[in-house]
Amino acid sequence: VFVSVPRVYEKVLARVQASLRSSALVREIERTRDDLDRSHRLLSAKQAELESELQSAADFVRAQLPLPGMPAPGVSMQWAYQPSLALGGDLFQVSAWGSETLGLYILDASGHGVAAALRAVALMSFLREDNLAKAVGSFDPGAIITEANRRFPLTQDGEYFTLWVGRLHLPSRTLSYAAAGHSGAFLHSLQGDSQWL
């Protein structure tokens, strides 16, 4: 039997090289798996942080809403607030605008999520009593909507607000209101009559 040494040497060398490549590939796969595990842990931690921040923002927006009950003698208010996401651009408020007037508004910033909520809170800040006195000079619903439209126009990205503003004069029980794209509010009288405004 004749055995060629160079041939055996080439086979052994090829097997050793294949084994080394396999070992290197195994080490590379293990490193990649470790990197993926580390990335997954980081992403999970970041997701938990973002969800916590989103919940905190949703809690802040909810805290801006009025409390159910009687904002003024003889005026009862009930509401349910259920945004489609944890956070959205729908807000409303009832607050004193002077000693004899209640201001009411319902607003909706287009879109959903954080961006819509931030735009809604910006408009809500504009609608505060002290700001309206300076910016508009009155609590007239039409004038308020006109100024809101000037300050918060339709953007190039298509972002917009719909808004309903009401003013209830308490001594006379007179409600005046204006709407800009919003369907309005629901009024229920003591006599049991209900109507959309």
Please tell me what each predicted stretch does.
Residues 2-3:
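Two-component signal transduction core modules
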Residues 6-16, 20:
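C-terminal output helix
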Residues 17-34:
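The C-terminal output helix
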Residues 38-197:
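… and, occasionally, acidic/histidine-rich disordered N-termini of signaling adaptors
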